Swiss-Prot record:
The gene is PRNP. The lineage of its organism: Eukaryota, Metazoa, Chordata, Craniata, Vertebrata. Residues 1-22 form the signal peptide. Monomer and homodimer. Has a tendency to aggregate into amyloid fibrils containing a cross-beta spine, formed by a steric zipper of superposed beta-strands. Soluble oligomers may represent an intermediate stage on the path to fibril formation. Copper binding may promote oligomerization. Interacts with GRB2, APP, ERI3/PRNPIP and SYN1. Mislocalized cytosolically exposed PrP interacts with MGRN1; this interaction alters MGRN1 subcellular location and causes lysosomal enlargement. Interacts with KIAA1191. This is Major prion protein. Residues 23-237 are annotated as: Interaction with GRB2, ERI3 and SYN1. InterPro entries: Prion, Prion/Doppel_b-ribbon_dom_sf, Prion/Doppel_prot_b-ribbon_dom, Prion_copper_b_octapeptide, Prion_N.
Length: 260
């Protein structure tokens, strides 16, 4: 790992050195190094706007074709199409779309921003279910094809599998000492929640249903455990990689080149 980090450091130093030097070189010339300027910023010999208030053909400061300070086509200071100082579409001083100005629009409270970090964490680990003490609801799964040892139960399962859970409730794998504890807890909570929810809708389960649900949910909880264990291992490996000294040194050097 240390050798890999050192080689990566050498490669990026060679790649970014020229870029860092080029960013610090002064560039010749620039915009507005001479020529016309706005009033009050003039330089000797530079062009300036005329000091008198009138525009072309206006004796008293008006716009084009306006004798008394109005905008285009307005005799008394109004905006375009407004005779008395109003904004666009307002005859008496209102802002755009409002008769009393636009300042009230800027006093509205801003909408709260969504915390993207929390959203990303919920999407990666599953949605936390309120009222279940930290349990999360896994993504939907296809119900496994299970054989129960006799034709009657196999046929009953195929005909009623849609009534059984397609998602399981679970806690993070790091809260359990082994897979069996995770699966046992996952099965109990999932069946209890599904039974209570379904019973409130007026549907009851027989002993055969409960027996089949236990087998189905057990397989789904095992699948969920394998998925969560793999994700937990990958997160741990990433933390080890980015905490190694060569990688930290490399990242610090890149930040220095970009910012400096």
């Amino acid at each position: 790992m240390a050798n890999l980090g050192c080689w990566m450091l050498v490669l990026f130093v060679a790649t970014w050195s020229d870029l860092g030097l080029c960013k610090k070189r002064p560039k010749p010339g620039g915009w507005n190094t001479g020529g016309s300027r706005y009033p009050g910023q003039g330089s000797p010999g530079g062009n300036r706007y005329p000091p008198q208030g009138g525009g072309w053909g206006q004796p008293h400061g008006g716009g084009w074709g306006q004798p008394h300070g109005g905008g285009w086509g307005q005799p008394h200071g109004g905006g375009w199409g407004q005779p008395h100082g109003g904004g666009w579409g307002q005859p008496h001083g209102g802002g755009w779309g409002q008769g009393g100005g636009t300042h009230n629009q800027w006093n509205k409270p801003s909408k709260p921003k969504t915390n993207m970090k929390h959203m990303a964490g919920a999407a990666a680990a599953g949605a936390v279910v309120g009222g279940l003490g930290g349990y999360m609801l896994g993504s939907a799964m296809s119900r496994p094809l299970i054989h129960f040892g006799n034709d009657y139960e196999d046929r009953y399962y195929r005909e009623n599998m849609y009534r059984y859970p397609s998602q399981v409730y679970y806690r993070p794998v790091d809260q359990y000492s082994n897979q069996n504890n995770f699966v046992h807890d996952c099965v109990n909570v999932t069946i209890k929640q599904h039974t209570v929810t379904t019973t409130t809708k007026g549907e009851n389960f027989t002993e055969t249903d409960v027996k089949m649900m236990e087998r189905v949910v057990e397989q789904m909880c095992i699948t969920q455990y394998e998925k969560e264990s793999q994700a937990y291992y990958q997160r741990g490996s990433s933390m080890v990689l980015f905490s190694s000294p060569p990688v930290i040194l490399l990242i610090s050097f890149l930040i220095f080149l970009i910012v400096g």
